[in-house]
Design a protein with these regions (language model features):
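Domain-edge interaction signal
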Residues: 1-170
Length: 170
């Protein structure tokens, strides 16, 4: 993932930004699984797929003053929020990341998705990538997360994961 790609993702969210590091990680993972060429390496973490690449580029852009990071331990608010700074938004409005344009609708909808659905759905998709079997992926993800695979929210997360895979064929 490069700066332009992260800025484009944040541009799609408008003034709302992205609420939380976990949400950012899951949205990037799911976009990449849908075929968006973000080139991030992901490992399985307690909260699902995690990429040091995403964390580093985000920290780098905050340090460079390109994006606004609100929240964190120093503010007493443990969840971070990321938004483009006005000058970055203005610069970005004059250029576009062509490769990402076709993922705008999906990216925008993912940033608004329920956080648990993103977390479990991305974990299911992570396991699906290893076995190419939805039943096994759901079972392994739910075992990993210690939740019931027959639960309504688990099945909704499975549908989210399947929807992401179906995007690759489009």
């Amino acid at each position: 993932m490069n700066r332009l790609q992260l800025a484009t993702l944040l541009f799609w969210t408008g003034d709302d930004g992205i609420q939380g590091r976990k949400r950012l990680q899951k949205v990037v993972f799911l976009l990449q699984q849908a075929g968006c060429q973000l080139e991030c390496q992901f490992t399985l973490h307690h909260f699902g797929p995690y990429s040091r690449d995403v964390a580093d580029i985000c920290d780098e852009m905050v340090a460079a003053g390109l994006i606004q990071e609100d929240g964190g331990p120093q503010t007493g608010v443990m969840q971070y929020k990321y938004q483009l700074k006005p000058q970055t938004r203005e610069m970005l409005s004059q250029i576009s990341e062509e490769q990402m344009t076709k993922f705008q609708k999906l990216g925008t909808s993912l940033t608004k998705e329920n956080l648990w659905s993103l977390e479990l759905g991305s974990t299911i998709l992570y396991f699906y990538g290893q076995a190419n079997n939805w039943t096994d992926a759901l079972s392994k993800a739910c075992d990993f997360k210690r939740v019931d695979s027959a639960d309504k929210k688990s099945l909704e997360a499975l549908e989210l994961a399947k929807r992401i895979v179906s995007q690759v064929a489009i």
